[in-house]
């Protein structure tokens, strides 16, 4: 009997139907995901709007509170000044009589003591109903955070307008309070003293903008608010802080006070306190552990003629090491110098400093914004954790850190959201920044010129070989190093390789024996690849860092291969030292002419080995020079700095950028040459400010040497992109603390102003030169001319100068120089 075939359970029609249903399901799921994404985007936008509004309102409360307090104080100050005017007129009428004591401070002190007992409360500024309504509003917003109801943009606009109006009045009050008014009795070195200058500040006369900065710090201190003093480097932030501490002592605050900063800045703090406020006791908290244990006891003792606790000056490292001892002190004022050191929220320094008990905190930094917005938020969170408490929200709203965005994209975003205007409004009560251009009468003008140099033939050969990773073949094949493996199969670290320290003996013969044993291994592990022609040249290739090799090639090919004289076996120093480097060709045209015109020059480089080659060039051209780098002792640094500042024959100062960027004064120079640029633009700016600062009497010109179309140019462009962020956030007209600057905060940044900021450059022209003469005499004259800066300094008013960028390009076909304007 034949078997009957049963019909298939799963038919082709069923399979087709299943596929159609699956496709329909996937399509439906895709649409659901799209809708969910859109819904999430809408909700997240609303949440960010609420958070932004909350931040604006909190900033608004601070501003309104400060404004009311300052207006009250302004009335009292006005009455005091009127009394002082009457006293001045009385002194003129009764010249032979003394109505006050020798210092003329009795009426002032009496008035200030009366004011000291007054108490302020936020209820004087905002009614209870207003505060409760704000709190209720935030509670309602949190309850509705999951809803999709749109938040009215007009509410935020209203808050911004309110903030603008309050901050405008606040800035006017700051400027009015610090209006220059000389004391009719007090004098310092025969010069009249500003009325606001504290009586214990006796070592000099404060400048008008320093008085204004002190008034701003006083306003923050009296109202229990922390802040950031971010004046440009070289404007005297230290003096303003010392004056503020002197003012606090005059008001009856006994201390102690704490100044915390990098080790290199401590001598300057101690010297400035001794110079300007000799009566105020200071304590350098440093030394061995035993020394510091003894010094802790002195913090709690009242000292000196004023019988107050000392101003304690210490370094970041000691503050972290002795946190247990220092955290138990109740500091009246904590000053963190070079505050950008705490830009990383996860670093140990910021964690330890947050534990310090301080009534008020102040950050000093000339570079409040270096790389990204989170660094600025880190500083603000350290000072005001209640206001700046959400980094993600802060970054999500002010997301302009994308360095790839074009100027047009940023302008379109600003037109739509006004995020920059909002950020300026929020930062206003807590940040004060003035530039040298704001105090142009005090500091001579400065111009920065970027000079593009070509690659010479040898540089081109090396550069191409480095990019192709064939550079080692040019100096002979190198034996591959045998890699020693650990028991787990991983390469052993060099630091883990065994060393028998018991073999070390005090006898010279044993030491020589040990050296002879380890020398072969040291030679095998050298990262320097020695070529087959050691008699003719010294080759230095660190093959593990290609980018550094490219930078060295741009600086000078001798950093990779330095020729050696076969007879003397010393480095070969001749004209090829100049002709083998595009930057040296530029220097060789500029430096002799600068010397002839009587200028003194600072040359900054990132690499000490580059300074060595520059020294060889100085010997070749018989230039008298000084040098400063991180390997030099303190006494050597002081000797070389003194020699450069006082000896007219010393023409050049060769300085490593990081070692010479902080804490030194080189105002004898009026020309700066940045031989190679830093990835961080603020490092180069700090280097420039060694000579462009208070005390400089001549215009300053900064020449930045850049090798065209190489990694050198990429570094400069990347640094310029970082400065673009600073231009937008720390706007030069929005944080001056005065009416002329901060009153502009009520206006939005228009598209034209943004475009000027984003596209602002230092160049207006290009110069093409032949290889035989990299710069023509005419172009060299244009490059070195600073007559317009001298006219600007004499006129004491801004004059649009000949700012420019000189792009030196090879033109092998046409030897004639062509100027394109």
Curated annotation (Swiss-Prot):
GO terms for biological process: apoptotic process; cell division; cellular response to leukemia inhibitory factor; chromatin remodeling; chromosomal DNA methylation maintenance following DNA replication; DNA methylation-dependent constitutive heterochromatin formation; heterochromatin formation; kidney development. One of its GO terms (cellular component) is chromosome, centromeric region. Pfam families: Helicase_C, SNF2-rel_dom. It is found in: Nucleus. ATP binds at residues 231-238. Plays an essential role in normal development and survival. Involved in regulation of the expansion or survival of lymphoid cells. Required for de novo or maintenance DNA methylation. May control silencing of the imprinted CDKN1C gene through DNA methylation. May play a role in formation and organization of heterochromatin, implying a functional role in the regulation of transcription and mitosis. This is Lymphocyte-specific helicase. It comes from Mus musculus (Mouse).
């Amino acid at each position: 009997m034949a078997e009957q075939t049963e019909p298939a359970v799963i038919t082709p029609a069923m399979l087709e139907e299943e596929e159609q249903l699956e496709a329909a399901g996937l399509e439906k799921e895709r649409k659901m995901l799209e809708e969910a994404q859109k819904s999430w985007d809408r909700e997240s936008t609303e949440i960010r709007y609420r958070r932004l509004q909350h931040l604006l309102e909190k900033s608004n409360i601070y501003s309104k509170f400060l404004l009311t307090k300052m207006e009250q104080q302004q009335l009292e100050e006005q009455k005091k000044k009127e009394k002082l005017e009457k006293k001045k007129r009385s002194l003129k009428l009764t010249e032979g009589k003394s109505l006050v004591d020798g210092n003329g401070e009795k009426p002032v002190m009496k008035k200030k003591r009366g004011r000291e007992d007054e108490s302020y409360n936020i209820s004087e500024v905002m009614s209870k109903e207003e505060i409760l309504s704000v709190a209720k509003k935030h509670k309602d917003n949190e309850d509705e955070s999951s809803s999709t109801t749109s938040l009215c943009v007009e509410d935020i606009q209203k808050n911004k307008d309110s903030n603008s109006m309050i901050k405008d009045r606040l800035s006017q009050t700051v400027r009015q309070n610090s209006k220059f008014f000389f004391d009719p009795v007090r004098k310092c070195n025969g010069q009249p003293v500003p009325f606001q200058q504290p009586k214990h500040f006796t070592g000099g006369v404060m400048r008008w903008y320093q008085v204004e900065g002190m008034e701003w710090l006083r306003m923050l201190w009296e109202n229990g608010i922390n802040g950031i003093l971010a004046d440009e480097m070289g404007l005297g932030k230290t003096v303003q802080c010392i004056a503020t501490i002197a003012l606090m002592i005059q008001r009856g605050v006994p201390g102690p006070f704490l100044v915390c900063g990098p080790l290199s800045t401590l001598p300057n703090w101690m010297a400035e306190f001794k110079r300007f406020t000799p009566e105020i006791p200071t304590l350098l908290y440093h030394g061995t552990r035993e020394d510091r244990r003894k010094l802790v006891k002195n913090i709690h003792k009242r000292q000196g003629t004023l019988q107050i606790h000392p101003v304690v000056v210490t370094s970041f490292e000691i503050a972290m090491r002795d946190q247990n001892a220092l955290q138990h002190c109740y500091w009246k004022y904590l000053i963190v110098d070079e505050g950008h050191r705490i830009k990383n929220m996860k670093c140990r320094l910021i964690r330890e400093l947050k534990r310090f008990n301080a009534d008020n905190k102040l950050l000093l930094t000339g570079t409040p914004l270096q790389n990204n917005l989170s660094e600025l938020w880190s500083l603000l969170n350290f000072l005001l954790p209640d206001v700046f408490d959400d980094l993600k929200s802060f970054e999500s709203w002010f997301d302009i850190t994308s360095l790839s965005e074009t100027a047009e994209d940023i302008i379109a975003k600003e037109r739509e959201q006004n995020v920059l205007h909002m950020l300026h409004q929020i930062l206003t009560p807590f940040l004060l920044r003035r530039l040298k251009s704001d105090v142009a009468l005090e500091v001579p003008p400065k111009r920065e010129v970027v000079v593009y140099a070509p690659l010479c033939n040898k540089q081109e050969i090396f550069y191409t070989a480095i990019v192709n990773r064939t550079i080692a073949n040019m100096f002979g094949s190198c034996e591959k190093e045998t890699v020693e493996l650990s028991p787990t199969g991983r390469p052993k670290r060099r630091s883990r390789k065994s060393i028998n320290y018991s073999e070390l003996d005090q006898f010279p013969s044993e030491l020589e024996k040990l050296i002879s044993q380890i020398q072969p291994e040291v030679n095998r592990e050298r990262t320097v690849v020695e070529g087959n022609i050691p008699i003719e040249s010294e080759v230095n290739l660190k093959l593990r860092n290609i980018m550094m090799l490219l930078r060295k090639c741009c600086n000078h090919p001798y950093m990779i291969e330095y020729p050696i004289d076969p007879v003397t076996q010393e480095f070969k120093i001749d004209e090829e030292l100049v002709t083998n480097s595009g930057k040296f060709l530029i220097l060789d045209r500029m430096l002799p002419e600068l010397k002839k015109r009587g200028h003194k020059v600072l040359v900054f480089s990132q690499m000490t080995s580059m300074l060595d080659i520059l020294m060889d060039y100085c010997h070749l051209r018989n230039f008298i020079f000084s040098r400063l780098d991180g390997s030099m002792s303190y006494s050597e640094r002081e000797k070389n700095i003194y020699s450069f500042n006082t000896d007219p024959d010393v023409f050049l100062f060769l300085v490593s950028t990081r070692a010479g960027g902080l804490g030194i004064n080189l105002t004898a120079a009026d020309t700066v040459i940045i031989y190679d640029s830093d990835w961080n633009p603020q490092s180069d700016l700090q280097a420039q400010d060694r000579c462009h600062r208070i005390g400089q009497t001549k215009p300053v010109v900064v020449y930045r040497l850049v090798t065209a179309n190489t990694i050198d140019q990429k570094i400069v462009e990347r640094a310029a992109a970082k400065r673009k962020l600073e231009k937008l956030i720390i706007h030069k007209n929005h944080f001056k603390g005065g009416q002329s600057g901060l009153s502009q905060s009520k206006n939005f940044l228009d598209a034209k102003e943004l475009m000027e900021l984003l596209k602002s450059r230092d160049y207006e022209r290009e110069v093409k030169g032949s290889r035989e003469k990299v710069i023509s005499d005419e172009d060299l004259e244009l490059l070195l001319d600073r007559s317009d800066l001298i006219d600007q300094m004499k006129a004491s008013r801004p004059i649009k100068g000949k700012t420019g960028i000189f792009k030196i390009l090879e033109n092998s076909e046409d030897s004639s120089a062509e100027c394109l304007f």
